[in-house]
Amino acid sequence: MDNLSAQLENQIDELKKLQKSVITYEQAQRQQLYAGKITDLKAFGKMLNDKRKSLGIELSMLELQTGVSISTLNRLFQDPSQVRFTTVFLVAQTLGVSLCAI
């Protein structure tokens, strides 16, 4: 009986360690999520443009992929508030940028 109690206590300790690991991981994920929060629209537009450049996508190619004109893309990259949200969403999605982390 003592052996079973000892084994049970060991299992409980292991579960507590695992629980702490999961909590630590979730906290790190939340911090990372909050760090990626959009607080400045112009900076977000620049980030989208930088992402486009890092992928090696020319404006003309992005225009073909999205159906969004180059002039609208330029406005979006300068100040996304000047462009419809559906357009921002489409371009972000095309570039592989998620607007929702949930």
Swiss-Prot record:
Gene3D superfamilies reported in the protein's UniProt record: lambda repressor-like DNA-binding domains (1.10.260.40)
Keywords, alphabetical: DNA-binding, Transcription, Transcription regulation
Organism, scientific name: Haemophilus influenzae (strain ATCC 51907 / DSM 11121 / KW20 / Rd)
Domain HTH cro/C1-type: 48-102
Protein name: Uncharacterized HTH-type transcriptional regulator HI_0666.1
DNA-binding region: 59-78
InterPro entries: Cro/C1-type_HTH, Lambda_DNA-bd_dom_sf
Upper classification of the organism: Bacteria, Pseudomonadati, Pseudomonadota, Gammaproteobacteria, Pasteurellales
Annotated Pfam families: HTH_3
GO MF annotation terms: DNA binding
